[in-house]
């Protein structure tokens, strides 16, 4: 098995750089019963339940992608947009995320080792 790839400290998609912040499981659930949270005011941050991230696999990937989709929604200004605009924007966003961002290595490791 290859060495485990750590979740990056930040992800850059286009001109948007978002910090990935791991928080203790107890804090995530005590503060508002969430596993992750996107903060859309600068500096952009995503808070992630470290227990889920440490477990890795499908749940960790789902959590990270879910929160990053909030970034895409914010980045492309998708509130009140038509379906085709939303789908096209997410296609562009996910392509950038999967092909060029700092998250690529972590995602590939998770997929190969799930």
Where are each of the predicted segments found?
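Metalloprotease/metallohydrolase-associated module, dominated by Zn2+-dependent proteases
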Residues: 1-58, 75-114
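Active-site recognition of the HExxH zinc-binding catalytic motif
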Residues: 62-74
């Amino acid at each position: 098995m290859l060495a485990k790839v750590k979740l990056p400290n930040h992800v850059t998609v286009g001109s948007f750089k978002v910090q990935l912040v791991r928080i203790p499981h107890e804090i995530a659930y005590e503060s508002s019963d969430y596993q992750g949270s996107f903060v859309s005011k600068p500096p952009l941050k995503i808070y992630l339940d470290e227990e889920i991230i440490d477990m890795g696999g499908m749940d960790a990937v789902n959590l990270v992608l879910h929160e990053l989709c909030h970034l895409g929604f914010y980045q492309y200004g998708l509130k009140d947009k038509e379906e085709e605009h939303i789908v096209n924007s997410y296609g562009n966003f996910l392509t950038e995320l999967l092909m060029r961002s700092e998250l690529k290595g972590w995602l590939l490791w998770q997929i190969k080792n799930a």
